[in-house]
Amino acid sequence: MFPNQNNGAAPGQGPAVDGQQSLNYNGLPAQQQQQLAQSTKNVRKKPYVKITEQPAGKALRFRYECEGRSAGSIPGVNSTPENKTYPTIEIVGYKGRAVVVVSCVTKDTPYRPHPHNLVGKEGCKKGVCTLEINSETMRAVFSNLGIQCVKKKDIEAALKAREEIRVDPFKTGFSHRFQPSSIDLNSVRLCFQVFMESEQKGRFTSPLPPVVSEPIFDKKAMSDLVICRLCSCSATVFGNTQIILLCEKVAKEDISVRFFEEKNGQSVWEAFGDFQHTDVHKQTAITFKTPRYHTLDITEPAKVFIQLRRPSDGVTSEALPFEYVPMDSGKHTFWNLHRHLKRKPDEDLFQQILRLDAKREVQPPTIEVIDLDTPKIDVQREIPSEMEFNHEESQQSEPALEQEQSVQQEQYTQEQSLQQEQYTQEQSLQQEQYLQQLEQQQSFQLEEPMQQDQELPAQQSFDQAIDHLPDHTSDHIPEDMEAADAHAEAEAHRLRSEQEKEIDTIIDEKVRELEQLDLGQQLEPRPLTANDKITEWMKSSEIEQQVHEPSPTAEADVLDSALEISKADKTLDELLETVAELDEIYTDFKVQRDTYKNTIQNELAGLQGRAPLQVEDSFDDAATYTSLQIAFKNPVLIPMDDIMPPTPPMSQCAPEDAHQHYDPVEVNSQARKPETPMRPVPPVPPAILTIQYPPEEDKLPPLPPKRIRKQDSNAENRSIEANTVQTKPSTGESPLNKRLPPAPKNPNFNTLPRQKKPGFFSKLFSRRKSKPDLAQGQENSSILDSKANSREPSIGHFNMQDPMRASLRSSKSAAPFISNPAPAKSSPVKAKKPGSKLTKPVGRSVSSVSGKRPAYLNADVVHIPLKGDSVNSLPQQQRTEGYSQSSTISVGAGLDRRTASALQLADIPISEGGMELVAIADRQSLHNLVSSIEGHFNVQLDPNLDLTEAEHFALYTSIPPLAAASEFDETSAYYAPVDAGEILTPDEVAKRLAAANGI
């Protein structure tokens, strides 16, 4: 490879080379010069590749293949919007057919194959571009050449594909594909390989040396570097300070943070921030640590610069100022204290402190006696001398201390003592002269009192208190000499005492002035003594040191005491404020407490004065679980305390909550509605097909739930309500009207919940028909009523005024009633409903209560349907008879002993008003009732005993035992809402049944 082949300056270098040869070989013979020129011409005749238009370095953005768009065309370096240019090459020294192969190589030497691909409209395949050069111009212009970048994970595959087509211009191999991090994906170079045609036409096997272009950078990564914001513009000289830098988009693999310092336009120090590629966030934020400054012992902040630098091309951003602060920055108090302690040996300070403490402990406290005749400066002069003496002793006892310091201190103390002695001597001389003048004036006044009296008004500066002396003396001159002498002596004595007082006041004023002057001199800055150093060190240890503040001296004890007094006063003030705050808090608390107590007392007083609510004390809200006793419409006043069980504890603890779950039953005798007067029963009309709809204003109360397990018994109660039996009275008296709620629309509707272990009431009320009965009932549906199939009596439509009184299976039945052809018989009959649809039997109901007919109505027969018996199982001639004529067991007029015992245990009356109480049930129900009685009363009855109807009646007339507190829950039917009605006792039930039957 020749120099002119690697760059585009070959033509321009020719003259320079010739000139250089002529200069170098001027002294050679002409023949040698001709030979050299001939060899140079031969070299020039060898063809080579020249790049006439370099590609633009930062004008193109590399596109990924997944972006699905054109990579764009690489413009030329001299391209403008008006005159666009493109990369161009030219073959020099050859004219003929030739082919050029263009591929991407790395930016740095050695030039290795780059994984990025070249794409274009023509000639581009497998990442390289192959074109035939124009043989006339020997120039090739690449006007449609783009760069398509690959991802890091695809580098190895791209280089492997390049290896398969054997495109390796500089024979460097493809081993770098296993080191993807060593490849700069943001910059490439274009490599041009030219192959000339050989002697065989169509075969280009003569290669020329390859040439490479200038680097081409990805415009996305090579954008302008800009620092937008720095979280801090200063750091300590130690470095390692974390800084967050915000910038424009940068490539995290090709960015660095540069710190540098310049002096006189030249860089004297340079360092780079420490960070990893993972510290670059979204290409717009860099978190790095500052480098260590080259000098640590700086006292002033050092001004440096910070900038972004791109290592690939060396481009830098605009430099911003940055400061390196001293290592004690932000710690002035600590470092100043440290330096102050290092000025003098620490042993000197500590020894001085210990010596003074020991001296204070040994010497007893002394009382200072102040002489008014002697100035206080003498006392103050003793303190430096004492300190000097102590210092000399310390120097003698500690020879290891520095002698220079002791000499300086001695000289200073001597000079101070001499100055103070001279000053005190001058002051004492002035005081003596002043006193002598005063004494002379006093003696002169005593010798010549009369002359003194005349001269006193002129001497007001000395004594203004005796200005009135001439007036007194002139007023008291006696006539005789003795009186004059006595008066003169008295006046002299008075004047002497006044003069002494004046002298004392003058001396005191002078002494104060001297003290103030001396104190002002002492407060002037001067070298520190041992005590000064101790005091300053103690204050600095408390972090109270201030720069250039004069240290307190031993003579300023008065100021220290005043400061202590002010601190004590301040502490006292703080304590007083605290006490005041506590007193205020206590007062507020007391007021609030009194207000709260008064409020409670007022409320209690208001409650006491308020009229009590009209609430019946006898009402027991826990008694609602006996809701089945409310069987009739009109209420009856009943003494609740005698019948109802006591209130459970939970109702007392949470009465409000109890009212949320059930409705109280109000029993008021005044609210009773007048009973409908009994009217005679009209004669039975012929059968008329009419549909009886039950009234909607009243509903039967639900049955009591079982107390064995907590469950929602509403479904069972609804099933029981829908399946009841009515008795047909034989008299014309009209009974009470009761109406059922509307039946469900679904004929197969069943509300019984599924229970794994059904209880007593579930077994008693939910017995179903057998399959043979259901099959037989479908055949005879046109003749028989659906209730006959289930053998279950019902009081779904009970109306004493209905001439065709009969039983329906449920309120769902809409078929007409068929009256019994034998009106003399008053027993309940099974009505026939031709054409009715057979309904699914529901739970058995034993809520029907009837009275046994008198003797003339076959009173010795108790009708108890046995298990398995039905109307279908009876002979055909008996189907039209009443229910009392079918499948009965004659018990007789009396009850057996076991039955009577069971009834007595259950507190059930056996007979009332010449009649016996009966009920209808099957054998399984009787067995369940016996088990219930045995469990409640703790007795053992005969398992084979069949209870009579009277025992079943006791199930609804007796009061259930007291409910446990655990049964008071929301799902229990004990608290189901019921309609207002009256609760009847067994006696009242018997009386009403007798009246209904005409007894």
From Swiss-Prot:
SUPFAM superfamilies: E set domains (SSF81296), p53-like transcription factors (SSF49417). Embryonic developmental transcription factor. The lateral or ventral identity of a cell depends upon the concentration of this protein in its nucleus during the blastoderm stage. Acts as a morphogenetic transcription factor that specifically binds to the kappa-B-related consensus sequence 5'-GRGAAAANCC-3', located in the enhancer region of zygotic genes such as Zen, Twist, Snail and Decapentaplegic, promoting their expression. Part of a signaling pathway involving NF-kappa-B and Toll-related receptors, that functions in the apoptosis of unfit cells during cell competition. In unchallenged larvae, expression of both isoforms is seen in fat body and gut (isoform A is more abundant). After immune challenge levels of both isoforms are enhanced. It is found in: Cytoplasm; Nucleus. Residues 710-719 have a biased composition (Basic and acidic residues). It comes from Drosophila melanogaster. Interacts with tamo via the nuclear localization signal. Interacts with emb, a component of the nuclear export complex. Residues 47-342 form the RHD domain. Residues 402-424, 819-829, 836-851 have a biased composition (Low complexity). Pfam families: RHD_dimer (PF16179), RHD_DNA_bind (PF00554). A motif (Nuclear export signal) lies at residues 668-677. The lineage of its organism: Eukaryota, Metazoa, Ecdysozoa, Arthropoda, Hexapoda. This is Embryonic polarity protein dorsal. One of its GO terms (molecular function) is DNA-binding transcription factor binding. Residues 677-686 have a biased composition (Pro residues). Residues 1-44, 389-424, 670-851 are annotated as: Disordered. Its main location: cytoplasm. Keywords: Activator, Cytoplasm, Developmental protein, DNA-binding, Nucleus, Phosphoprotein, Transcription, Transcription regulation. One of its GO terms (cellular component) is cytoplasm. One of its GO terms (biological process) is dorsal/ventral pattern formation. A motif (Nuclear localization signal) lies at residues 756-773. CDD domains: IPT_NFkappaB, RHD-n_Dorsal_Dif.
